[in-house]
Swiss-Prot record:
The keyword Lipid biosynthesis does not apply. This is UDP-N-acetylenolpyruvoylglucosamine reductase. GO terms for biological process: cell division; cell wall organization; peptidoglycan biosynthetic process; regulation of cell shape. The gene is murB. Pathway: Cell wall biogenesis; peptidoglycan biosynthesis. Belongs to the MurB family. One of its GO terms (cellular component) is cytosol. Cell wall formation. The active site is at R172, S221, E291. It is an enzyme of class 1 (oxidoreductase). Its main location: cytoplasm. Pfam families: FAD_binding_4, MurB_C. It is found in: Cytoplasm. Keywords: Cell cycle, Cell division, Cell shape, Cell wall biogenesis/degradation, Cytoplasm, FAD, Flavoprotein, NADP, Oxidoreductase, Peptidoglycan synthesis.
Length: 302
């Protein structure tokens, strides 16, 4: 463990968990111990923590909700940062300011009860708002950047609020400076009737359960959809429905979901993902790209 991590307990007010198994915090239920999992109580404590880690060149990453992450079996030599306490919501007419640690589903429900429309699809996407922004999360033709107005980053020790015009984003991606942290986002929503918003949310949940009723631990869609294609269809065409390596398996319900059948390892999932990519390339001539972030044993970044 990095020596500098021990001294954080001298001033840090939030929760600190040393040698914490990542498997407890990742939806795939895999991953070895991280040296330190820190949960700052405020933006200011986050700023102080990130500054110290960077000064001492200690690797770090933002855990988010753990729903789009595949760590290593050996764990992570550095600091994982949870933003779950940085989750405030503020409303100004139809503009919603929400911090990165809030959950997507709680945000979707909160604005729906206010008769605000534009992010109904988030009800079916587990994880945190920061994670949703980082990957430009979306479903059924909608994505979060369709309503993003500004994004606040912690970059080189300073908070920066960037307007939409200065942001670069695309399908399942949002480009941010290396080692910066998404802290908050403002969303431009629109007014609608409470009944209409609730109805669309129920429709989104219905679509999710009809197509993605996967009962085993998973990370959601594992691969991005190639242009004009669906990853699940390509995987199915390659004959991989139900294919497994160790206890990691291609779901028989939705083939773009890789599931943990019980006691799977991160190595099982990495081997399975590699096998899927190889078979799809050989069968369909298309190179799949992971939507899930593969976390090595000590790398910096969100």
């Amino acid at each position: 463990m990095h020596a500098g991590l021990e001294h954080i307990r001298d001033w840090f007010k939030g929760e600190l968990l040393f040698h914490e198994p990542l498997a407890r915090h990742v939806s795939l239920k895999v991953g070895g111990p991280v040296d330190l999992l820190a949960t700052p109580d405020s933006r200011e404590e986050l700023q102080q923590l990130v500054t110290l880690l960077d000064q001492q060149q200690i690797p770090r990453f933002v855990l988010g909700g753990g729903f789009n992450l595949l760590p290593s079996d050996v764990g992570y030599r550095g600091c994982a940062i949870s933003l779950k306490q940085i989750n405030r919501l503020q409303l100004d007419d139809t503009v919603v300011a929400i911090e990165a640690g809030a959950s997507n589903q709680s945000l979707a429900r909160a604005v729906a009860e206010l008769g605000l429309s534009g992010i109904e699809f988030l009800i079916g996407i587990p994880g945190s708002v920061g994670g949703a922004v980082r990957m430009n999360a979306g479903a059924h033709g909608s994505d979060i950047f369709s309503v993003v107005k500004t994004v606040t980053l912690l970059d080189q020790g300073q908070f920066r609020e960037l307007p939409r015009e200065q942001l670069t984003y695309g399908y399942r991606c949002f480009e941010i400076p290396d080692n910066s942290v998404i802290v908050a986002v403002t969303l431009q929503l629109s007014e609608d009737s409470l009944q209409a918003v609730r109805s669309r949310m129920e429709e989104q949940l219905g679509l999710r359960w009809a197509t993605q009723n996967v009962k085993f631990p998973n990370a959601g869609s594992f691969f991005k959809n190639p242009p004009g294609e669906s990853a699940w269809r390509l995987i199915d065409q390659a004959g991989l429905r139900g294919f497994s390596i160790g206890n990691a398996q291609v779901s028989e319900v939705h083939t773009n979901f890789l599931i943990n059948r019980g006691n799977a390892t991160a190595a099982d999932f990495r081997a399975l993902a590699a096998a899927v990519k190889e078979r799809v390339k050989a069968t369909c001539g298309i190179e799949l790209e992971e939507e899930v972030q593969l976390l090595d044993s000590g790398e910096c970044g969100q």
